[in-house]
């Protein structure tokens, strides 16, 4: 329910880690109209080239039959493809991305007419071809048709929280939104973890946040033991398409690896029970 909590850092590095380190086949879907996750995988020039060649982005999933979209050469009319023809971008072996697009703002925000289920329907079709081990959806921080679509397409959700009062107050609002929205659709989601991000260990702010989560009757059971440390260079690394796995920072990498491992273990345990 709040931006700037390390959501994109967590989602992109989670995908990169399990694809490169674990050899899992992963799809990242960038559902945030600001498409920050996409910019972690593309340079500006490469992204413009990708779009100008008519390749697919999340707009392909949500546009109506005819939609005016902006390109580097001006506005043109696009026709929605069939799901089987919407192809994700292969970043490297095992790692695919359905890029975000600023034009998502131009698609009607109104729900209904099956629009809320388009992402779910697309993933059902796409997974028959690619057989992904995991699909990770990076969502906008506020309630919208895009968040609803992501929730309906998901079995689990992960909550990143920056250790400050505004951020961890927002997790209760997020929980209320998820419960309310999914109740309307009769869809059940499980929380696979609450991850502390941008952490400065030993600070008063961090200790208070950790105490709050540890004592909370609901969220304490979901707290991931490892966390993502604060590094001022992370935005610069992202703009140069560099991931935590490739950085010479053992503490940062160890934290990420622990977060990824625990999230996967939680999901595996849920799957065994069900």
Model-inferred region functions:
Residues 1-274:
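P-loop NTP-binding core
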